[in-house]
Amino acid sequence: MFDEVKKSIQWGQETLTLETGKVARQADGSVIATLGETSVMANVTFAKEPKPGQDFFPLTVHYQEKYYAAGKIPGGFFKREARPSEKETLTARLIDRPIRPLFVPGFKHEVLVMCTVLSHDLVNDPDIVAMIAASAALTISGVPFMGPIAAARVGFADGEYVLNPEVQDMDHLRLNPEQRLDLVVAGTRDAVMMVESEAYELTEAEMLGAVKFGHEAMQPVIDLIIDLAEAAAKEPFEFASPDYSALYARVKSLGEADMRAAYAIHDKGERRDAIEVAKAKVLAGLSEEELLDPNLGSALKKLESGILRGGIIDGRPRIDGRDNKTVRPIDCEVGFLPRTHGSSLFTRGETQALVVTTLGTGDDEQIIDALHGNSRSNFLLHYNFPPYSVGEVGRVGSPGRREIGHGKLAWRALQAVLPAPTDFPYTIRVVSEITESNGSSSMASVCGGSLSMMDAGVPLKAPVAGVAMGLILEEDGRWAVLTDILGDEDHLGDMDFKVAGTENGITSLQMDIKVAGITPEIMEQALAQAKDGRLHILGEMSKALSEGRREFSAHAPRIETMTIPTDKIREVIGSGGKVIREIVETSGAKVDISDDGTIKIASANADSIKKAYDMIYSIVAEPEEGKIYVGKVVKLVDFGAFVNFFGKRDGLVHVSQIAGKRLNHPNEVLKEGQEVKVKLLGFDDRGKVRLGMKMVDQETGEEIAPEKKEETAEG
């Protein structure tokens, strides 16, 4: 019934298995990849005809983590998987980015890749497994895909690279000082196609070494996919890249002169308008048949690409007049908004980010519901890219994959320099509003985010800056690395290489390569050039603010932290939360109690914090023998007075300890409700508190000297 094929290898510490032919047999390609006990099913389908007039490649990648994979039931009212989580969105991008450039040029049929996590052992992250499964499914599907690719995760601990570290080692990397790197690399047998990483001030050499280590480690996986394809691949889909050389020649003859003139304009807006005029002139000169050719868009792009790339390779200035290593002019401003906790406006050329930091309490932490368990994050970074930032009219709604991906990249770059939660017990939310964009807006978010947090008083270990690098690589082997690329250079170039870090090292690296042939020499040059650019930007940022402010904004909350014995937590909370509610209502402060006995008291008002602190302290602290306390008489009896002191504690002042003279009854000198000063004398055999008054001056609260007590008794 089934024509099943299964291939396995030992990969690192686990067995990697690829199997096909048993499940989802109506898909063009279906593979279940299993690493350890983590299994991901990848299914590929593609249209056998392109849609008429379609001039782009419609590739869609979906990745979904099924809760049953980890033996869990989804939360929420409907109890089923709903919209993609941030992790699912980011993993879909990880799969998409290395495979998209590997489809045969000119292939514009719709392709759908669906990856579903079927089992998760809570040890091996399913993202790497999904990338391998997707590559294998594409390779056996018959679609014109120039793969396969493979992927690997690389860690760095004790000076050694680690292949595919466990989930728990990578989770909350900031709190794991032994692990300094989380890097995902994907590539073919000969070339690296994609890198995504989070690092802790690693050197350029260490980062490059990690990329090489990951690329070498994935080679057995590529061999395994080829082995599977030899046994199970379908017949290749007949497709030849279209020959539009005649159309390109017509487009070039009609528009080259005007297009070159347009690309000589330095201002983005004027250049864009001139390009549109040049395109309109080309279209006006084409025949009706040529206008309907689905390769017209490709011909126009080839013309633009040749003009932009050829000038750079020949050593001429870039389209905005810069050389290959110069960063655009930078302007930094902090304290830009009056009522926010921290803000900055970072402008680099025609790219601008307004970045705002808000400080919150433990109640504001993000709760993350993942397959491997729930967790909380006290650092959030949100990136918004509205249409007006590029002068366009477009859809406005919830953040898309691109915004989530760019926000996560900036998050990775900045979180490496955050203080430990124990040293800075605030929740930090950074929002980057891209107000102008002409390339590298995610790196502008990094720079603006660093300034904004320092403006809010966050004690960063060091400022962070980021820069986007580009590459022009010609077929004849000539190449040029570009610093601080423009949007057009990103669109028409061969590499997008984003590097962020401090003066001491790299905190985040993201690389997307559109062509094969990127050598270690090119990557070394890109990293070296990126370091120079990063240090220059840090220097410009330091002119606005070089370290975190000593004082918070008047509108930001203050947080006081105290630790109590865990057996006292019940007393602070009280029956049904009665005590903690009273503390919050009386003081006006927010109080957050952790299971380990850590209490965070937050308020914008210092008096509120002190009041809540004192109320909690009076509940949990133990009175000390020999100390003097202020109390209130709550009951008088023949043998003495019961006094409430030190919060809710009661003690007995024996009638002989009330005054320096003999009393027949305490009511001779005391009345209920009277405030008195008492000294804790000790505890009786049953643990009852013994108090004294006669040795304390009731006016000053000071202890009376022995000779003075004798004089008082004689008088």
Swiss-Prot record:
Top-rank lineage group of the source organism: Bacteria
Q: List, in alphabetical order, the GO biological process terms annotated in this UniProt record.
A: mRNA catabolic process; RNA processing
Q: Which PROSITE patterns match?
A: KH_TYPE_1, S1
Q: What is its main location?
A: cytoplasm
A Pfam family hit:
KH_1
Q: Which CDD domains match?
A: KH-I_PNPase, RNase_PH_PNPase_1, RNase_PH_PNPase_2, S1_PNPase
UniProt keyword list: Cytoplasm, Magnesium, Metal-binding, Nucleotidyltransferase, RNA-binding, Transferase
* EC number of this enzyme: 2.7.7.8
The answer to whether the entry has keyword Disulfide bond is no
Quickly give the catalysed reaction: RNA(n+1) + phosphate = RNA(n) + a ribonucleoside 5'-diphosphate
| Localization per record | Cytoplasm
MF (Gene Ontology): 3'-5'-RNA exonuclease activity; magnesium ion binding; polyribonucleotide nucleotidyltransferase activity; RNA binding
Domain called KH: residue spans? 557-616
Q: Which cofactor does it need?
A: Mg(2+)
Q: Which residues form the S1 motif domain?
A: 626-694
Q: Which residues bind Mg(2+)?
A: 490, 496
Naming one, the record's GO cellular component terms include: cytosol
So what family is this one in? Belongs to the polyribonucleotide nucleotidyltransferase family.
Quote the function comment for this protein.
Involved in mRNA degradation. Catalyzes the phosphorolysis of single-stranded polyribonucleotides processively in the 3'- to 5'-direction.
Q: Which named protein is this? A: Polyribonucleotide nucleotidyltransferase
The organism encoding this protein is: Paracoccus denitrificans (strain Pd 1222)
